[in-house]
């Protein structure tokens, strides 16, 4: 499935010295988001910073949203994860995409201009309504939770 999303460039370096968001491979689910800063930034251990991307998107279609997710290598190798764990971008949001970056390691981490720091994945959305009931139709699982369907 291919969807066209409106993208607004908020910083003139985007598309010039800092590439536009792009899929790294044909099989990539996420577009790499890059940091749009002027100079290297130190992120201290346990510090959280809000990093600009220099872009805004407008999804427009209420059946679509986007999520900002961490890059696995940064988290595993450097302890760099998203401060909010997942960033949800609603279809009607039009502001700059910013990345909450948390250094959960015990080492300082340097973020350089243009670094790929997160990824943007588009997802389908179902807007549900609720039907208030007194009882549910019984299922095999019932009310079991928190490990009830397996060892963990």
From Swiss-Prot:
Cofactor (UniProt): Mg(2+)
Highest taxon in the source lineage: Bacteria
Top EC class for this record: hydrolase
GO biological process: dUMP biosynthetic process; dUTP catabolic process
Catalytic function, reaction form: dUTP + H2O = dUMP + diphosphate + H(+)
Pathway: Pyrimidine metabolism; dUMP biosynthesis; dUMP from dCTP (dUTP route): step 2/2
HAMAP family: dUTPase_bact (MF_00116)
Protein name, entry field: Deoxyuridine 5'-triphosphate nucleotidohydrolase
Source organism: Legionella pneumophila subsp. pneumophila (strain Philadelphia 1 / ATCC 33152 / DSM 7513)
């Amino acid at each position: 499935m291919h969807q066209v999303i409106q993208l607004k460039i908020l910083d003139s370096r985007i598309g010039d010295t800092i590439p536009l968001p792009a899929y790294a491979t044909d099989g990539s689910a996420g577009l790499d988001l890059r940091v749009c800063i002027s100079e290297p930034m130190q992120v201290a251990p346990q510090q959280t910073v809000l990093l600009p991307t220099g872009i805004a998107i407008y999804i427009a279609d209420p059946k679509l949203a986007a999520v900002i997710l961490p890059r696995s290598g940064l988290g595993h190798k450097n302890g760099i994860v998203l401060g909010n764990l997942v960033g949800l971008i609603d279809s009607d949001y039009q502001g700059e995409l910013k990345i909450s970056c948390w250094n959960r390691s015990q080492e300082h981490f340097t973020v350089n201009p243009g670094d790929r720091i997160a990824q943007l994945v588009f997802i389908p959305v179902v807007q549900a309504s609720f039907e208030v009931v007194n009882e549910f139709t019984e299922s095999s699982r019932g009310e079991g939770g928190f490990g009830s369907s397996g060892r963990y």
